[in-house]
Amino acid sequence: MKNTLFALALLVASSARAQQVPDTGFKPPIPNPAYASGRGPRVVVDGGHHNFHTADGRYLPFAALLRRDGYRVSGSTSPFTADSLKSADILVIANALAAVNSEASGNWALPTPSAFSADEIAAVKRWVEAGGALFLIVDHMPMPGAAGDLGRAFGVEFSNGFAGLKDPTGARPPNIGPMAFTVANGRLEKGPWSEGRSAAERVESVITFTGSAFYPGPKVTPVLRLPEAAVSLTPSAAFEFGPETPRVPVAGWCQGAVLEAGKGRVAIFGEAAMFTAQLAGPQKSPMGMNAPEAKQNFQFLLNLVHWLSRAAGMPNG
């Protein structure tokens, strides 16, 4: 029975992944934009590291939302250097991959080497410490392998797997589907990301959609905290689960966190769909900010970016 359940999970998850398209009709209200149109900080979305999500692809709704809030959003295919980073106030890296694990390769199996060179990681760290803001978004395996070295540079350790919740009865495999982080259930920590600039921007609930877990170092502030039942399934190939797939206990680990690094700021999140709006599978089911259960995700994203850019009116801004 467990073998059948694992096979079904593989079929459903891998099918949805292959058919994700941006929901260009997603336009939630922004009654109080942080900046005048086209006058806000420069947000550069990485597209130069075989990224599964880019500003003109699956992260198009992400880019569109920030533009409506006044940010100047562009994509970039340049390697990370001191010169290339001069064009950014906020650098967004979403689901970067090494060439061997690119979407085009069709190979989401181990090994999963770094998507970034040592020189690029050093350049990003220096840029942040000088005042830049990094938004690092790392989905399930193989993405944590690709981003692991960059994460370590900022004090976090990723599990190269799929974060899920154990079945209380033990009769079913862990659930790697949507996960709720709320103030009420204790998984969403309060802070600028939840409070926003006013009561109208307050967030009580955030939904994630199949991501990774990471261990926060001592200088890292948890935002989304995984519960006691959390485990990380670490298969040798993405979505290829079985009864023998290793399970790493990750209770108390994070799926979202922030930190200060020198003069700069960093937000690290272990799930990507939560920050975009997609239509998944043959039925074009909403997944992400457009999902009915994720109504506050878009405001959570805006609050995070307001914190990164030190927008006027933000707590600790």
Regions found by a protein language model. Give the residues of each.
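Sec-dependent signal peptide recognition
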Residues: 2-7
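Hydrophobic h-region of N-terminal signal peptides that target proteins for export
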Residues: 8-18
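Short, surface-exposed patches at the edges or C-terminal ends of soluble domains, predominantly
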Residues: 18-317
